[in-house]
Amino acid sequence: RLHTDTDEWIAPTVVSDLPEGTSVFTVFQKVLADKGYTYEYHEQYCYVQAITAPDGTRLAEFSKGQNSGWLFRVNNDFADVGMNDFVLMDGDEIEVLYTADYEKEPGMSLPYTDVSWDHWAYTAIKRMYTRGLMVGVNETTFAPSQEMSRAMLAVILYARSGQPAVEAANPFTDVPADSWYTDAVIWAAENGIVSGFGDGTFRPNDALTRAQAAVMLCAFAAFTQDDVTARADLSAYSDAGQIPSWAMDAMQWANARQLIIARDSAHLAPTAATTRAEMASILSAYIRK
């Protein structure tokens, strides 16, 4: 789809039979050529400078002010790379849009003062924020280095599933009836996404380890009928022996899917707590794959 801030230029168009590795730019070029549009592209900085419609109407950067110009997003997410570098997958939806002020476009920036544009997880955090799956600990703080709790991930996965009605009984002695995470934890337990401990507790406020995160996410993937058969060989990691037996399959799957990767060249850190930034990165990768 191609549109300006006031008009639809190219209605949603299906492009099929594309080879693996096709970029947004390839599809952009094809559709514009097919529809009789031309464009100007900045090769060095990899962005669209101007587009001209078949009737001669030309819209370029700065045509409507210093913050105006062409943007693109895929699946409603603004990209942090140029069109040439964004590789598409089946079902991706491309939107090329002209904005009079990019600062006013939802999803172009984050409201958090502790996540700058050069933070390693900025793009992932922004994706989770714009999708409503992760928010800050308050209006201006995301707390990227804060540990995730077990309840937090249950809430995110519950939100990802549309927050269906919960009718099952509460199986845990330490999950109160009226907490912010109650429905999410009960739903996750009912659907085999979480399990508790031998003493009947869930321990919702405990830090979520990376191994536990892998198990929950793998179970969620199975629940949504995603393929969970992939397995990676983890023997090269020096701490592979620290992976609990109950988490081995899930860790192998998560690593094969590039969801949970090494914290450094040699360590998976399976027993370490998962930070909020790491969880944003893991979930962002899962959604993209």
What are these regions (language model features)?
Residues 24-31, 153-154, 213-214, 279:
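Amphipathic, non-transmembrane alpha-helical segments in extracytoplasmic/periplasmic proteins
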Residues 34-37, 92, 131, 192-193, ...:
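Loop/turn elements at helix/coil->beta-strand transitions in domains of secreted/extracellular proteins
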Residues 20-28, 148-149, 209, 275-276:
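Short, structural beta-strand-to-alpha-helix junction motif
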Residues 6, 78-84, 88, 97, ...:
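Feature responds to low-complexity, polar/acidic, surface-exposed segments characteristic
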Residues 249, 255-257:
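GST-like fold's C-terminal all-alpha helical module
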Residues 1-111:
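Ubiquitin-like/PB1-type beta-grasp interaction modules and other compact soluble beta-rich domains
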